[in-house]
Amino acid sequence: MGSGLPLVLLLTLLGSSHGTGPGMTLQLKLKESFLTNSSYESSFLELLEKLCLLLHLPSGTSVTLHHARSQHHVVCNT
């Protein structure tokens, strides 16, 4: 089994455009192969967009992926 690459996915759920709603943090570990199997930038942005749909996050939800090398951000548009 390959070593895992620690990634922290922070999901900030906003109840309104003023940011007064509830918050949630989800931590995930993705395998090293995730980085080597596809284009780095587009893979993370695509992952964040799919999480919006999979978790049924409301439109306007801010989703940020923090990684040692970079940070990726998407606002859900469902």
From Swiss-Prot:
Residues 1-19 form the signal peptide. N-glycosylated. InterPro entries: SFTA2 (IPR028198). Keywords: Cytoplasmic vesicle, Glycoprotein, Golgi apparatus, Secreted, Signal. Predominantly expressed in lung, where it is detected in type II pneumocytes in the alveolus, and in nonciliated epithelium in bronchioli (at protein level). Also detected at lower levels in cervix, esophagus, stomach, testis and kidney. It holds the Pfam family SFTA2. Glycans are attached at residue 37. It is found in: Secreted; Cytoplasmic vesicle, Secretory vesicle; Golgi apparatus. GO terms for cellular component: extracellular region; Golgi apparatus; transport vesicle. Putative surfactant protein. This is Surfactant-associated protein 2. The gene is SFTA2.
